[in-house]
Amino acid sequence: MRGPVLSRLLTAAALAPSGHNTQPWRFSVEGERITILPDPSRRLPVVDPDDHALWISLGCAVENLVVAARGEGYHAEVDDTGLDGEDPVLTVHLRPGGTGDTDGNGLYSAISQRQSTRRSYDGRAVPVADLGRLEGASRQEGVGFHLFTDPGRIEPLIEWVEEGNRRQFSDPAFLDELIRWIRFNPGEIRKLQDGLTHAAMGLPSVPRWLGRFIMGKLVTPGSQARSAARAIRSSAALMLFTSERPDPRGWVSLGRSFERVALTATTLDIKHAHMNMPCEVPALREELRRHLELGAAHPLLLLRLGYAKPMPRSPRRPLEEVVVKGSR
């Protein structure tokens, strides 16, 4: 495989979303085999103690790699048998023979445009046909996809999101972990190339000491709950992803499904943003599962959909920081 092609594939994979933009992945390349490994130094032990969000992010990276490979004229075969080992990994085998259609359904181009857009939306409804395209893109074995457009069904979900915010922002450990990953000024962004930028969080550019003060004193559980409720009510819909399996294989499958939906939404100029709070608090997640009559499925990703202007893009670390040499 030519170097420029490999670089484009790895860049596409590394543009996947991740909790707090931790970018918790490493890539090992041997010939036409790419191994995707978790980076344990980038775990979120407070908000994601079982690592389900980490593995969802790796699933998103895999899906980006598959989409990019197809666009570059390669067929990508995903081998998830490595997830059964003591140190789980994913492997993607590449061989010539993909479509070579660099923008077939627009997904390849959408990789660099996709973003979590955390601003208020304009309230416009998403056409039924476009919602159908999102549902079609979500199909993945073991993954459930649920759309909510009726205000009567959305309002109860808002209450869970509000309560999730109140519980999380009342937890000093949660707040400390969040602050650790906020980049409060351009200097921090340039130096670290990861985390949640001050612009994405709706904060001014300030020194870290002042940012910590703002987050600790001025951002309250109540204000966060109210802000989340306003954001959802400005949106056209909510979408929920569930997994039948509470293990890396199930979480990776959910990540692949979500990333296809996110890329498809991007081609339709539909924005999305995470509202995961009730999925991140175990007691609320169980209440949500019972309320929605999900059976044994686990609700893990809740997002809002709608239309809005884009926000500044989140940074990414350079490839030399995420590509490891040789076998693991």
Located regions from the model:
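Acidic, surface-exposed loops and disordered segments
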Residues: 1-328
